[in-house]
Amino acid sequence: MSLLNNIANYLLSSKESPKCAKQFVPWSQLSNVLIIAFDNQLSNVVNFINACQKENIKVHVAVIYDGKLEQTPKPNFDHHILDKKQFNFFGIPNEGAIETLNSKQFDTLINLGNAEQIKSLAISKLVTAKCKISHFQNPIFDISIDGDKTTNSSKFLEQVIVYLHMIKTTHK
């Protein structure tokens, strides 16, 4: 890990998302999902979004974009662009960006970034969701679905659907 990431992780350690009751939400009970993705991963989320729409599950994508403003992606699904101006020097999002994302209630948050990408890690920590999912181990996440380095985001999202179908809830 770089010195910059170490400093960012230290700064992030003092921040918390608003409290939310943690819960493993099965696929059949999902209503709102947040995907944290980088602009080069947008084509990989389309199949997941289509699968969700068939089940009347709303999906919102937080797109981390570091490019030029005039080349900002305009995907055909519910999204929020987080550009360079919405992060500080260390990659931690500003209050406004987090407030915008926290204005919706999410059952599940899915981080498509990796352990070294502090921007997606910071958003994952600061946004409220009942269940947080990633493909790497971190205390922030409730479910970590291990995949190898060659697994692309589309395959990972297919695995997320499989795992969410496997969750069983007991009603008392």
Language-model segments: residues:
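Active-site-proximal region of nucleotide-activated glycan assembly enzymes
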Residues: 139-172
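Histidine-anchored nucleotide/phosphate-binding helix
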Residues: 34-57, 61
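An aromatic- and histidine-rich active-site surface loop
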Residues: 114-127
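Structural motif
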Residues: 36-40, 65, 112-114
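Short N-terminal or domain-adjacent regulatory/targeting segments
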Residues: 1-31, 40
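Glycine-rich, highly charged phosphate/nucleotide-binding loops
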Residues: 14-18, 81-99
